[in-house]
Amino acid sequence: MSDKLHVLLLNGPNLNLLGTREPEKYGHTSLDEIVSELTLQASALGVTLSHLQSNAEHALIDRIHQAKGNVDYIVINPAAFTHTSVALRDALLAVSIPFIEVHLSNVHAREPFRHHSYLSDISTGVICGLGVDGYSWALQTAVKRLSLSH
């Protein structure tokens, strides 16, 4: 592993449709635009950023497993898996990599089934309702915490 810190950005189901899917809830910015902006931000902060978006739970879990020993921090928007995936929770626990949970919308102001997260209690923190800015805040926080621990 290089000396450069590595942050992994994970995005769950339907986030590939950002920019066109329910823009009143999720905004008009595409996932590609978000990732491009975060990649520039990561570079300016002196860290490496890698990204995976998948609609398949197993692909996200496999990537989390591969992160062990190679990734210093995870920023994850698990999308609908937030409310359903014990397997995603177990994968994050298994690798012991700190992570921040991000949601574009305020999940607590939405349908009751969205109020529960299987990840929040094991995360470093949760950012929700700040739109695409939440990703930037999560990346900045991850880098700050990594800098303090190294």
Swiss-Prot record:
Q: Which residues bind substrate?
A: 77, 83, 90, 104-105, 114
Q: Name one GO molecular function term.
A: 3-dehydroquinate dehydratase activity
Pathway listed for it is: Metabolic intermediate biosynthesis; chorismate biosynthesis; chorismate from D-erythrose 4-phosphate and phosphoenolpyruvate: step 3/7
UniProt xrefs under PROSITE patterns: DEHYDROQUINASE_II
Sorted UniProt keywords: Amino-acid biosynthesis, Aromatic amino acid biosynthesis, Lyase
Which InterPro entries did the record assign?
Answer: DHquinase_II (IPR001874), DHquinase_II_CS (IPR018509), DHquinase_II_sf (IPR036441)
Which parts of the sequence are marked as the site Transition state stabilizer? Answer: 21
Q: What is this protein called?
A: 3-dehydroquinate dehydratase
Q: Which organism is it from?
A: Erwinia tasmaniensis (strain DSM 17950 / CFBP 7177 / CIP 109463 / NCPPB 4357 / Et1/99)
